[in-house]
């Protein structure tokens, strides 16, 4: 997205930019024909320090359950294990800020999912959560009556997206979700990646737990879905 350059003549403060490559090998990528539209209000990239309104390559996207727009599937990850009877989740500050923005945009609590096993390499489940507040490094939820490992995914619930509609922001595609007034706005997504060999070290919000990795790969390559990815790791 192009932006008007504001200010007086002269040298402005420099801004850095680093290319990102998420595909491996020389095989041609496969894109969803015709592209799609991203929900600018409900999308963001908490991993992009200082620029959460810009989606980076490696961001996993999915079609919302209603409205036909695409948004990022994973909001962030927990930074501490969740213990039964807790009413909070511990996350990074950027993740808490993004969830707080979603709550403000909705004007109410947001329905999300906490995806992970109760212990390392255990059975993964997507547990529905309602986040009523987010501040600092804390998300406020109700007691879940279960446990989850640290690094569990905070993502859209099953009722919030269309199964089999996953795609990924491709190499060097940095998608600015803000308009000229810095307000969030829907944006074109002309190259939704739905096939190729992926460097998992470059996929944003990629989990560390082996069973969660397997679970997420299953979502990306769901039977009957539109995507068909290969991964460079053996898991």
Regions found by a protein language model. Give the residues of each.
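Surface-exposed, low-hydrophobicity beta-strand/loop segments enriched in small/polar/acidic residues
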Residues: 1-235
